[in-house]
């Protein structure tokens, strides 16, 4: 008996669900990553400039934190200044 390998993964339990992640450092990004692993479309909002502090936190490899590489997978990121009206308006239109 042979096993068949699926070339196309099956959709996750959260396929079709959009999540807006606004957290920083560990807890928020971890939750967003986990939801993305279950198929959610995760959009991370970061402040313009430095972005999430996790990008530069410990264990820098090739200019990027290993923590960031792990916690940012399965996501799309957008830089918006939510302190400004324009950033707030864009977040409602595009997300």
Predicted regions and their residues:
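N-terminal helix-loop segment corresponding to the beta1-alpha1 unit
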Residues: 1-93
């Amino acid at each position: 008996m042979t096993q068949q390998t699926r070339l196309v993964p099956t959709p996750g339990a959260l396929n079709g669900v959009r999540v807006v992640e606004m957290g920083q450092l560990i807890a928020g990004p971890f939750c967003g990553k986990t939801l993305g692993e279950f198929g959610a479309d995760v959009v991370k909002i970061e402040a313009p400039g430095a972005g999430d502090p996790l990008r530069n936190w410990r264990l820098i490899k090739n200019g990027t934190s290993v923590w960031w590489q792990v916690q940012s997978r399965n996501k799309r990121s957008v830089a918006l200044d939510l302190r400004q009206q324009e950033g707030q308006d864009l977040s409602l239109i595009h997300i």
